[in-house]
Amino acid sequence: MRYFSGLTLALALLFFPPCTLHAQDLSPRAYLITPIHSNAVTLSYSFSDGNINFNGALPVSDAKGRYSVPIFAYYHSFNFFGRSANAAAALPYGVGNFHGTAADVPQHLYRSGLVDSFYRVSVNLRGGPAMPAREFVKWHQKVLLGVGLNVIAPTGQYDPTKLINWGANRWAFKPEFGYSQRWGNWILDGYAGGWFFTTNHEFWSHTSSYPGTRSQSQKPMASFEGHISYDFKPGVWISLDGNFWIGGRTSVAGIENPLTKQQNSRLGGTGAIRIAKHQSLKFSYSDGTYIRYGGNYQSVSVGWQYSWLGKPN
């Protein structure tokens, strides 16, 4: 039982902090602007499968995970003191199986439920004034600079008596700086930010072996992301994507485990194509290139988007 508890604890630390499903995300063209009053809804599905690297933190072998995450998302652009700005929200649902061998005993876990919701707001600082559609069609991008704030709210499924939960029972915040520059049909994007976490005050608590409560905390984690993309024609483009994040050591009941420090990177590609006036499809693939601690997954996703232009007030 001691090693099985260690396995489930490690899985909880690896997969279900708020940063986990989002720190590995690759999001090309996140700081491109759209006309004010633009709206979009997106339905997407992602599938991830791969190994789990414990970096010697636990005597666990053959640890693997496979999960699916359908997501509903909404996007809206607006005028913020003369600058282009936008806000987005995403509601994911997770279904996954996780297994490994601890003390020569195979173990298997299954979870299904709501994942913590994700929110983002960004504001252009240079190169992208707020514009209605009639002005936007005459505008040509050069250099864009912006700032953003990503927030993960504790709205996912969480049971403090279980170690594996889709929700993390805490908030996460990521302030970010974004850069985008166009050369003809090419666009270069770069983002830099950091994740900050509140404390989960009911981590694996109220159990028969531990009737009280204990806390889980996590150190900040730096995040860097870059993309280079090419436009074939309006609404049709591809990109090469990469990211790197470092930090995020975790502590349980005030005891820090230095082996849980993350120092990971992913590489992938994205493609988008417009299929109708208001509809488009997006496909993406990514894989871990260096995973010091955490899930080393291959991930594929497909999304359908419907967009429209709202009427000014």
Question: In which residue ranges do the predicted regions lie?
Answer:
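Residues on the lipid-exposed face of transmembrane beta-strands in outer-membrane beta-barrel proteins
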Residues: 43-45, 72-76, 119-125, 149, ...
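Outer-membrane pore/translocation modules
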Residues: 94-217, 259
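Surface-exposed strand-loop-strand hairpins of Gram-negative outer-membrane beta-barrel proteins
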Residues: 48-69, 106-107, 160-167
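Outer-membrane beta-barrel biogenesis signature
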Residues: 21-42, 61, 127-142, 309-313
